Amino acid sequence: MNPEIFAEELANHGFKLSNKQKEQFATYYNKLIEFNKKVNLTRITDKNEVYLKHFFDSITPLLEFSDLFKGEKSLCDVGAGAGFPSLPIKILCPDLSITIVDSLGKRLKFLDELINDLSLDKVTLVHSRAEDAGQNKNLREKFDLVTGRAVARMSVLSEYCIPLAKVDGYLVALKGPKAQDELVEAKNAIEVLGGRVEEVKELTLPDTDDERTLIVVKKVKATPKKYPRQAGTPNKKPL
């Protein structure tokens, strides 16, 4: 997917990129490749692949569930790595307030430089483990939306993310083709943490056989205070 086809696909979904937005994605790609020589951010470096498997893939929740992102919403991206999915979404939705939580300082240095290069405002970087962020009173139950992409299986991701969502907020999980199996495994965790599965959308990336699944979990009640458990526990002993 070259940049022109990327723009066409977005236009087909009702998102016409301005010249500024096209330039922001081009800058994003160049910065990613440049920084990737120093810090391992991605194994995908071919331009067409980055536009498809990072940029377009990150934007799929916005294309499928655009109403969730309307207005001046707050979004917390857990374990964003190189900024996926939150920063491609931010480029298309400038009114969004983004908070990125990541545990690796080198990745945050990249993100800090990238945000500056893209001239993005209302983006906050938090150097923290997800479990610690969920117990931080400045972050816990503060966000309209929480996203996670390629972070952990659904039962673990739920414990990382649901505590950060406001009641009536949403977790949007970007998963691969085996998400239904993960959902069965995560049923108890989602319920215990105060969530309810609202929607599961299966899709294929354009002109490929690459299957993706988007899972939307609505937070219907407050998360019990003991969750998330201390760092490392959710992964070792999933709910």
From Swiss-Prot:
Intracellular or extracellular location(s): Cytoplasm
SUPFAM superfamilies recorded: S-adenosyl-L-methionine-dependent methyltransferases
Record bears the keyword Transferase: yes
UniProt binding sites for S-adenosyl-L-methionine: G79, F84, A130, E131, R149
GO cellular component, one term: cytosol
EC number: 2.1.1.-
Main location: cytoplasm
Catalytic EC class: transferase
GO molecular function annotations of the record: rRNA (guanine-N7-)-methyltransferase activity
Alphabetized UniProt keyword annotations: Cytoplasm, Methyltransferase, rRNA processing, S-adenosyl-L-methionine, Transferase
Gene3D superfamilies noted in UniProt: Vaccinia Virus protein VP39 (3.40.50.150)
Domain of life: Bacteria
Methyltransferase in keyword set: yes
Family to which this protein belongs: Belongs to the methyltransferase superfamily. RNA methyltransferase RsmG family.
Function statement: Specifically methylates the N7 position of a guanine in 16S rRNA.
Protein's name in the database: Ribosomal RNA small subunit methyltransferase G
Organism, as annotated: Lactobacillus gasseri (strain ATCC 33323 / DSM 20243 / BCRC 14619 / CIP 102991 / JCM 1131 / KCTC 3163 / NCIMB 11718 / NCTC 13722 / AM63)
